[in-house]
Amino acid sequence: MSKTPLLDTIRTPDDLRKLRIDQVQQVADELRQETIDAVSVTGGHFGAGLGVVELTTAIHYVFDTPRDRLIWDVGHQAYPHKILTGRRDRIRTLRTAGGLSGFTKRTESDYDPFGAAHSSTSISAGLGMAVARDLAGGTNNVIAVIGDGSISAGMAYEAMNNAGAMNSRLIVILNDNNMSIAPPVGAMSAYLSRLYSGKTYRSLREAGKQIGKHLPKLIADRAARAEEYSRGFMMGGGTLFEELGFYYVGPIDGHNLDHLLPILQNVRDAETGPFLIHVVTQKGKGYAPAEAASDKYHAVVKFDIATGTQAKAKSNAPSYQNVFGQSLVKEAAKDDKVVGITAAMPSGTGIDIFEKAFPDRTFDVGIAEQHAVTFAAGLATEGFKPFCAIYSTFLQRGYDQIVHDVAIQSLPVRFAIDRAGLVGADGATHAGSFDNAYLGCLPNFVIMAASDEAELVHMVATQVAINDRPSAVRYPRGEGRGVEMPDVGVPLEIGKGRVIRQGNKVALLSFGTRLAECEKAAEELATLGLSTTVADARFMKPLDVDLVIKLANEHEILITIEEGSIGGFGSHVMQTLSDHGKLDGEVKMRAMVLPDVFLDHDTPAAMYAAAGLDAKAIVKKVFEALGKEHAAETVKLA
């Protein structure tokens, strides 16, 4: 007998809406169990999805999705949404090759009107859809669901300020799962929320506003303030949103369908807006291990449902993020000017390690990359040595600040760029594909890439020593190569690479951790009679011009390899060769970069193979440059 009999009858939300209202709770309970079971098989973001099971069910029951547009901010919490919207049969393919995305994705379903993965975009996108509806004479609803972490970012407030000024009929649901704004206050809160979302109250409020326009300004202002304070006193937490022009409803218990359903129905039927519904939920709701340790169950690998034990693979080498964190601790122990900054990702970047040693010198600024960069710039003006540790994909959000506030002023902000290159299961939205290109075009920037974990130690020490300009070191997600680690970092000579293996026919110049694949390729090429030099560039800016020219002069073929897009390291090498007249027939130059597409999720190894950046592809590229036939399937590499 099925454990999910009602859920089994639901193919789309149309089926859900055919059920009686007293059956909705059972659907939610079964949906939670299905979510737990699915993620135990696939891994993925877990706690946030469990926290919005009732909210997801209620939204799809009350609103006419997909005609009514439903936007999930970030998308971590969208797994239950996917199950209810025709994707249950594929839910156990989450984040695997050819399977469902771990986030919302427009090309995946009509029920995903806007793709997500980075935070704080939902209100802006929702407002755009609401305005488009109004211009087209439509009547559908637009609902944006955003978490209390995401709503802290500046973009969310920019959007709310705009929406409030336009009086747009937009519904924003604030999913407060950290109790960071205000807790629900029981039955009275639920009753007042239902009252304030109802038509009678809104009509009276609008009438009051119209009367206020004809009163003397002092009296009108005091009346408005009295109404605002009375609501703030009774409801707790809504004053800011009211100031931005929203009707504030809440806080309400996001796990109580008796509270959620009537409020959503009231708001659905409203003719005015915008609304902000403040819903309080619990991460990991309904699964005891996740409720007890929400941080450990935010994102999980495969796990045993009965025990909660996650099937984590045994580590063979330290992770790059931990090497960075530990290296920064050692440098800070010698230099009290070193500080660490992260934008809501302390454990993901290794800043949590630094925080344990130096809590007073650690700053988590929240989801605020723009602020993080300029905050670091301010610290640098006063002689401090800020390390701004941000994922490559998120650093994009602070690009103007990098240019205007850091680079133009030559301020020595140190950027630790984690998750550089392809990241695997999180796919295109989280890939660190572009930082070589978007930083490489900036004057007076030192840009490094660690080829292994030992090199990262030295590059952190190098950054500490750079006091006259900004610097960046990029490194990938995951474990290092298992190389011997230095006790302390030693600053590298700026702008100088190193030769790993000497040959005379082919030169492979690597920037970053593709060095290991270059070494594999060199071994294979040697068995095929091609003497191959392997070099580690270390620096993209300033580039080791002497090394580049030497490689070009002494080899028939020069190939660059990087874990980045077009416009990055290879482009800098080609510009140097062009400047020195080395592209006039003297050397066959090839640049191996990520393909000019957004790659879908898979394992990192599979993604690099698909991108043509593994050892097999390097060997093939060499023979293509030589003009000799060499079928890819004959290349046998370990």
Swiss-Prot record:
EC number in record: 2.2.1.7
The keyword Transferase appears for this protein: yes
Pathway noted in the entry: Metabolic intermediate biosynthesis; 1-deoxy-D-xylulose 5-phosphate biosynthesis; 1-deoxy-D-xylulose 5-phosphate from D-glyceraldehyde 3-phosphate and pyruvate: step 1/1
GO biological process, one term: thiamine biosynthetic process
Any Pfam family hit: Transket_pyr
Superkingdom as given in the UniProt entry: Bacteria
CDD domains found in the cross-reference section: TPP_DXS, TPP_PYR_DXS_TK_like
PROSITE patterns per the UniProt record, alphabetical: TRANSKETOLASE_1, TRANSKETOLASE_2
HAMAP family membership: DXP_synth
Self-association state and partner proteins as the record states: Homodimer.
Protein name: 1-deoxy-D-xylulose-5-phosphate synthase
Gene that this sequence comes from: dxs
